[in-house]
Amino acid sequence: MTPSAASALVEKTPLETYVPPAKPSLIGLSRAQLCDRLGDVGVAPPQRKMRAQQLWHWMYVRGARDFSEMTNVSKEMRAMLAEHFTVDRPEVVAEQISADGTRKWLLRLPSGGDGQKAHEVECVYIPETDRGTLCVSSQVGCTLNCAFCHTGTQRLVRNLTAGEIVGQVMVARDRLGDWIDRETPNGNRLITNIVMMGMGEPLYNFDAVRDALLIVSDNEGIGISRRRITLSTSGVVPNIKRTGDEIGVMLAISLHAVRDELRDELVPLNRKYPLKELLQACRDYPGASNARRITFEYVMLKGVNDSLDDARKLVQLLKGIPAKINLIPFNPWPGSNYECSDWDQIEKFSEYVFNAGYSSPVRTPRGRDILAACGQLKSETEKLSVRERNALRAMAMTD
């Protein structure tokens, strides 16, 4: 495939122009890009690779928030770096902690100056007995308008940069005390898994998501295995194969319906990439095997997609795909037109799929007491007055 043909496959959405801060953050740059930035400010070529590696270690292993913490870098070099760059990550505007331990953060992104509105996104930490999963956003808002999703009620503003995506992981480690230090030389390992299931469609922001996940999975940095990173897409078919080839993470498909006419309603992207095309892309996904199964997410909507006939059709659709099915009880949010399926019906659906040979875990609802529907915390805080938002921000800054 020619470069021009490949680029033609990349989906585009109308976006607000991103204006970087006056002093850009080094978070989210590759090693080669770090070397280039160091060259821009006069670091001699023989030193660039070594200095870039020092920065990489301090940013992604130690979690340094300021150049002054980088004690094996000379004072002169630290001063020069601080003059031109930062290692800023997003700012915590609000934090909600659920009774079940789930944490949700509303994060303000660095803006390009007084003339640009500071945008906000969410990320969520879900602790479990055997893992800790961080749900990360890829866009400010979303363009897909999925009928059951709260983020779909918010217009797409812009894509996140690689640094803003990596920054969410770093903020979570900051808040959880999950970096390496003298007391915890191997880290606490509270964040073991990453899921790209927050605000936005990751495959409509492919380049930034790819660059961010390559940093997050780098063994000499944050070091989360690619087998513990899952990218969820609503079905941007042209970029599914690229995900396997260029990122190599686990794939999840927001399926939610087994017939095109219903999926057209629930996931409007289906009108562009119908089920036949989507499932063929899954069959062709690089590296898919019984050891690296594709997850199909299926939100359980009462009287809409939860019949045993739907379960039978689901099994037929997935024939030949190394798959597991993640059944998701619908998480209600104000203004939604749907209800969660009855628990007995969810269990019957799960049992049928399991007996057909597919793993069919039912996702345990988490954090319902802290505005857990994706996008809901952002929507609720936008209704607050400036004084109330400042109070939330002050509370979030208090550990």
Curated annotation (Swiss-Prot):
* Annotated disulfide bonds: 135-374
Q: Where is the Radical SAM core domain?
A: 128-371
Q: Which residues cross the membrane?
A: none
Residues engaged in binding [4Fe-4S] cluster: 142, 146, 149
Catalytic site positions: 122, 374
What is catalysed by this protein? adenosine(2503) in 23S rRNA + 2 reduced [2Fe-2S]-[ferredoxin] + 2 S-adenosyl-L-methionine = 2-methyladenosine(2503) in 23S rRNA + 5'-deoxyadenosine + L-methionine + 2 oxidized [2Fe-2S]-[ferredoxin] + S-adenosyl-L-homocysteine; adenosine(37) in tRNA + 2 reduced [2Fe-2S]-[ferredoxin] + 2 S-adenosyl-L-methionine = 2-methyladenosine(37) in tRNA + 5'-deoxyadenosine + L-methionine + 2 oxidized [2Fe-2S]-[ferredoxin] + S-adenosyl-L-homocysteine
Catalytic class of the enzyme = transferase
Q: Report one GO cellular component.
A: cytoplasm
- Compartments, record wording: Cytoplasm
Pfam assignment, any one: Radical_SAM
What molecular function terms (GO) are annotated for this protein? 4 iron, 4 sulfur cluster binding; metal ion binding; rRNA (adenine(2503)-C2-)-methyltransferase activity; rRNA binding; tRNA (adenine(37)-C2)-methyltransferase activity; tRNA binding
Q: Indicate yes or no for the key word Metal-binding.
A: yes
Record key words, sorted: 4Fe-4S, Cytoplasm, Disulfide bond, Iron, Iron-sulfur, Metal-binding, Methyltransferase, rRNA processing, S-adenosyl-L-methionine, Transferase, tRNA processing
PROSITE patterns named among the record's database cross-references: RADICAL_SAM
Free-text function comment from the UniProt entry: Specifically methylates position 2 of adenine 2503 in 23S rRNA and position 2 of adenine 37 in tRNAs. m2A2503 modification seems to play a crucial role in the proofreading step occurring at the peptidyl transferase center and thus would serve to optimize ribosomal fidelity.
Add the further remark from the entry: Reaction proceeds by a ping-pong mechanism involving intermediate methylation of a conserved cysteine residue.
What's the family?
Answer: Belongs to the radical SAM superfamily. RlmN family.
Please identify the protein, giving its name as recorded.
Dual-specificity RNA methyltransferase RlmN
- Identify the coding gene: rlmN
